[in-house]
Amino acid sequence: MTDSVVVLLVEDNERNLKLARDVLEYAGFTVLVAMTGEEAVAKAKVATPDVILMDLQLPGIDGHAALALLRADERTAQIPVVALTAFAMAKDRDRAMAAGFDGYLEKPINVRVFPEQVREHLRTEAP
C-alpha cells in the first residue's frame, strides 16, 4: 500500500517537480520536496523517506555530491536513492550507478509507469 510510502523528490525545475509530485501524490505516495542538494540531505536526515528521487544537476551541490553525503551518514545511508535525470546516454547511467545510486530513471517521466518505477526501488524488510 503506497499511502504510507514517503518519497523525497529532489528537483530544481519547477515544471518537472510539479509533474512528478502530482503523479506520485495521485498514486498515493506522500511527497516531500527539495530543490537543492543541501536541502535534500537536510530533509532526509529529519524525515527519513522510504526512497529519494534525485536530479543530478542541482544548484549548490549536485546529485552525486548529495548522494555521497547521504551515504556517509548512518541516518540516511540505507535509503534507496534513484537518479532522476535528463541525461540519457549509457555513460551517464553507468556513472550514476558506479557512484552508488540504487537506480536510474530518465526524464521526462512517463506518467503511466512512473509510480511503478518508484515502487520497484523501495526496500522491503521481509523477503
Give the residues covered by each predicted segment.
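Conserved acidic carboxylate
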Residues: E11
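C-terminal output helix
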Residues: I109-V118
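Charged docking surfaces used in two-component/phosphorelay signaling
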Residues: K18-Y26
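Active-site residues of response regulator receiver
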Residues: D55, T85
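Short hydrophobic/Thr-rich beta-strand motif most characteristic of the beta2 strand and flanking loop
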Residues: G28-M35, K43, L105
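Residue-level signal for the "D+5" position in two-component response regulator receiver
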Residues: V33, L58-I61, Q78, A90
